Each structure stands twice: as structure tokens, then as C-alpha cells.
């Protein structure tokens, strides 16, 4: 489950009269054919048919080779990924926007990867928007890490969000640590990340990954 958002003057949401034609600018295992450096020379051609491009998660992420497509983010403020460097990403966004194409970031904030079960999240430095270090105390208490002796007593006292619906709606994400969005520190870090992605990297909007994993009241 995901949610798309385009920046407006108030909240990040899709306008009622939405007429853009979107291109998904990647595939699950397309690191070679859709790297930033490969897409950049095609920016003008893309602009002939599309007004919006959805790019894959651009933050540094867990995994190697074709298994690392960005959906287990390791450090949000590090925009060097398997798709290319931050410099290459910014150059791609600049060329797309020069042709009138808006660019969506694939945002993964439901969960984080680290060095261990409950520790090892690198510090995120968003410059003027703040510096944040998420810790074990920012992980939901019902995360899989709760079963690890090394994490005993370290997790937050917050449960993961659940829609009170069948299991496919809400609940935890086993492959990485679930962040407790009910905590102010987590929400502040996410907010700084989004503003930084817009103002510093140049994105126009967001596609939210695993949006079912946290309270929708926090997306606005």
C-alpha cells in the first residue's frame, strides 16, 4: 500500500483535478538500465510524453547488488545509493524539471535498517533543518527486535499502528525495524527529511511506501 503526494500550498496531497501523466522511472531489478546517469540523457525524451516521473528510493540502503533497491533505508540524509550518487541524482532532477517534468521521491519512513537488531542507525544531518539520531527507543515495542536479548528494555513503549482490520491492513514490517511514529522525535526527523528532500535535493512530491504501517494522521 502506498500514497502519492504533490506539494501544494497547504498539505502534500494529490489535487482533485490531477492531469499529470506519470512514468515509473525504474523497475525492481533495473539498477543498470535506470541509474541516474542513464536516465539523465533521456530527460528531454521523457518530457515529450510525461509530466511526472516517480523515482525509486534514493537514500542509502541495506543490501548489495541487485537486492538493494532502496526499500530498507539505512541513512536518509545520505543520498548515495545503488542508483547513483547524490550529484548524479540532483543533475537528473534538474534536467527533468528543465523540461517541465515534476519528480516524485519514493519515501520509506515506516522502517529503518541499521547495524544490528535495535542499534546502529546512523545520524541524519539535514543541515538547517536539524540533526537526528534515531535509537532503539524509537522502535515500536512489538517489533521483531523485542525477541532479541540484546534489545531487552531498549525499545519504546509504543505499539505498531494497526487499522483494526484484517492483517493486510497495518501491522509490522519484519524485514526492518518499525519506527514509532507516535513519538515526537520520529515525526520531527521525518518532517525534516521531507523538507530537506524538497528544498535541497529538488523533489516536487512524494510516494509513501508502506503507508499502512503508521497512522495516516501523520501524513499531511
Give the residues covered by each predicted segment.
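Active-site environment of divalent metal-dependent phosphoester hydrolases
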Residues: 214
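Substrate-binding/active-site clefts of carbohydrate-active enzymes
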Residues: 12-44, 48-201, 217-220
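Short catalytic-loop micro-motif centered on adjacent basic/acidic residues
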Residues: 205-211
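Bacterial N-terminal signal peptides
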Residues: 1-6
